Amino acid sequence: MKKIESHKLHGGDLQVWQHTSATTHTEMKFAIYLPPKAIAHETAETTETTGQRCAVLYWLSGLTCTEQNFIQKSGFAEYASRHNVIVVAPDTSPRGVDISGNDVPDDSAYDLGQGAGFYVNATQAPWATHFQMYDY
């Protein structure tokens, strides 16, 4: 996995990660917000090597969204920070090319193909190879 963004926000840390998914056979991204209590801290009195356990909320965006829509537009971080909630926002679908260099199927309709945001496993060609979003 590779961290591609990191931003301090309401005392916590908003990160975006990219990884190769064995489920979609593509590079996928997800955002994660770690509230202050989830982050390890060092003070003069103590050194915490791990943060505290926090509840986790998985946000699944809708049609035409990416992992960026929710984290940029919702204003969630203040609440998540105050209530010690880790928020995970995955991308909505595979995009671009797969790990073999083949194009991921797409469609000209906004509600089918890349960015469609259906969290189900496709069962028919050409979608079944990459669109396994329930499992992802």
Language model features: what each stretch is:
Residues 1-136:
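Non-catalytic cap/lid and distal C-terminal segments of serine-dependent acyl enzymes
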